[in-house]
A protein has these predicted regions:
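CheY-like receiver
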Residues: 31, 139-142, 204, 208
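Conserved mid-sequence domains
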Residues: 79-173
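Hydrophobic/aromatic beta-strand patches that form the interior of the parallel beta-sheet core
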Residues: 97, 175, 192-194
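Long amphipathic alpha-helical segments
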Residues: 1-88
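Short beta-strand elements of ligand-binding domains
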Residues: 172-180
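Peripheral docking tails and interdomain loops at the edges
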Residues: 179-222
Length: 222
């Protein structure tokens, strides 16, 4: 018997485009359910969801789609990712605080990092887009997290807030994420970098901080 051909990431992305950019939210949710069922959460995020969202932004910036289409696609994806956030958290797991820098509204990559960390047994406090550094610092003083992940698409956003990030780094480990996380700005902020794909970045953080083996073993069975 011939093994059925698997749908490629490109084909999944085309299906999302055909539904969401035609304002078919129900169809878009159906495609997303199929994507996650076939690929699993992490591969779906890395190979379909995040690349598709990047393409949506590119098409909006070139005028290929309108604001309404971009909003529908973004809102459907945000609602689906929000459902996944927190799944798998363990009461004894380490805590991560996640936030975008002031002025940064691109949060989907950070949401993906939060999802993967929670699936690895972490507890997460997700502050989201455009978080003032004073609020980030207050949250860290209150919760005393094992790690802080901050995201920005421009290195200047990190550099402008470097003094505040250095103060936070005195009591916890800070990890810079997204394209703005250059080596130079990480050094300036007394932080490390989560280089590359948000899913891989979450796994790197998980492994580098020496999470107890029991959590790693149980999380991989999810």
């Amino acid at each position: 018997m011939t093994t059925p051909r698997r749908t490629t990431p490109r084909e999944w992305m085309n299906r999302l485009e055909a539904t969401l950019e035609a304002f078919d939210e129900t169809g878009g949710h159906r495609v997303l359910s199929q994507v996650f069922d076939e690929l699993g959460v992490e591969d779906a995020l890395s190979h379909v969801v995040l690349p598709y969202l990047h393409e949506v932004g590119e098409r909006w910036s070139t005028g290929s789609i309108g604001v309404a289409q971009e909003h529908v696609a973004s809102n459907v994806l945000r609602s689906r990712l929000s459902v996944l956030m927190g799944a798998g958290e363990r009461p004894e797991g380490p805590l991560a605080v996640l936030a975008c820098m002031p002025g940064e509204h691109h949060e989907f990559g950070l949401m993906a990092t939060s999802i993967v960390l929670s699936r690895l047994g972490w507890r997460t406090c997700y502050l989201g887009a455009n978080t003032p550094t004073a609020e980030l610092a207050m949250t860290c003083r209150t919760l005393r997290p094992a790690a802080v992940v901050v995201a920005a698409h421009r290195a200047t956003a990190f550099a402008a807030n470097a003094p505040a990030l250095r103060r936070v780094a005195k009591s916890t480990t800070i990890h810079l994420a997204a394209p703005g996380a250059t080596a130079d700005v990480a050094e300036l902020c007394h932080a490390s970098r989560l280089d590359g794909d948000p899913v891989r970045g979450a796994r790197t953080l998980h492994e580098d901080l020496g999470v107890p083996r029991s959590l790693i073993d149980e999380s991989t069975a999810v």
